[in-house]
């Protein structure tokens, strides 16, 4: 069996960075910085603002990678909600350690959204998963779990009002406010119920200590369990980020998603600069791509760093920022010697020429150049295709709380962008393959909508798009339940090969004939779960595919499958030369298959 070889860790960055002024065990002023990472758990830096010296405290609970909710209370205790473990952590300066206080709400609160404090010092935590609400009393070290604040939506962002009631901003499909009374357990919707994509709404604490609803449907003050209409909303209450002497802290490289260079700005105008050489374990890899220059390019996730691996000299380089979308690149495609990078959030497109110097920006001449969102709905551009009409095409999951991910295109010559909304109803376009002989694009869909939604359709489909006449010419699906067409490939024989998942059935490979418009074959994938975008043509005319536990070879002539590499595989990658590349978490790897 073919062996797996290690290349290295392309990116070591951090995410969900927050900072607060505080004091150490000895009472000296310090800065607390909270950072997340994928290859290890979240951590806290305690920084001396005079010297830049720091100590690093890493959470010990497995799966606590992301500090998605943070709060510094009035007694200098720093609280952190960790995703996706759903645990609450506390850095107590008196104990001088990072403590795991326990699970917020077992099996329900995997992603803490916001932490706030009421007048009695009790913490209130809202979470993603079930839009639940939980309190934690530092005096008794007890959690009290109050359950869902909404029966449909999944995100809860609470704020404690001055009367002891808790206002919960519920997102994503119909954002609205729910007021919860801890004394009697009653909850009530107050103010407008908005629709994502049509209206706006936010919940704020203002300088008068009151909570307000600011929405496109009106402005309101929350009094008890009522929303009272107001003409104006006071300024928001500011969070103190200054040290006792008035000094402020900042990262000068935060716009590059690096967070290593820090500055302390003194009230007298003096500036102290520090390099923070903390340990970061590595950022997970989200996508791998074969560039036009024979190198492998890829994207880390949260934050998005663009990286390059050169097989000729084994050079592995973190190139840095390539998009104003800071999440991750979902897909890429090559056209006329350039790489087009499609990134989350917002399905933002960047254009990169590997033959020219690297200088990110948004202006002509920048390289990579961010040219903006491809449309107003697309958010997670799962597939990018180059070629038809000289354009870049994307298939995307829509924005949070929305359904109906479109097929969209961008013309690099003119800068024109176009989206075909509602092309598959409440499903989303997901995968793409080019049929040059038929002058069509094959589009595979998923039943999923944007994050925070439940599917409205039961079956994913494959459809053929006539890009010249801008219309569907055929659509259909397999005779089995399908949730997602998660890989599509035009084989050297002109047929479409793909993988489908979901519907309570084993995942399958299929063959589709674009001439007869029939699914001619379908059969189980080898062991494991088929990876997204996990199919490609090899130099030998065969098709190579990834599952979560193997790499396999499919002979189009016989449809025989041979497993050629066994192991663990997280993200599929390209064939370059004799090697096939892939990644597991933060590690880039390859196997020699030719």
Predicted regions, residues:
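Surface loop/turn motifs at the tips and blade-to-blade linkers of beta-strand repeat domains
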Residues: 6-13, 58-62, 102-107, 146-151, ...
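Conserved beta-propeller blade signature
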Residues: 30-34, 77-80, 123-125, 166-169, ...
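Short, conserved, GDST-rich strand-edge loop motifs in beta-rich repeat architectures
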Residues: 394-404, 443-459
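Residue-level signature of beta-propeller blades and closely related beta-rich strand-turn architectures
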Residues: 37-38, 84, 129, 172-173, ...
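Blade-level signature of beta-propeller repeat domains, shared across WD40, Kelch, NHL, RCC1
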Residues: 566-594
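A short loop-to-beta-strand structural motif that recurs across blades of beta-propeller domains
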Residues: 43-45, 87-89, 132-134, 176-178, ...
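Short loop/turn segments that connect beta-strands within beta-propeller blades
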Residues: 48-52, 92-96, 137-141, 181-185, ...
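Repeated scaffold domains used in trafficking and secretory/extracellular systems
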Residues: 12-23, 64-70, 109-115, 152-160, ...
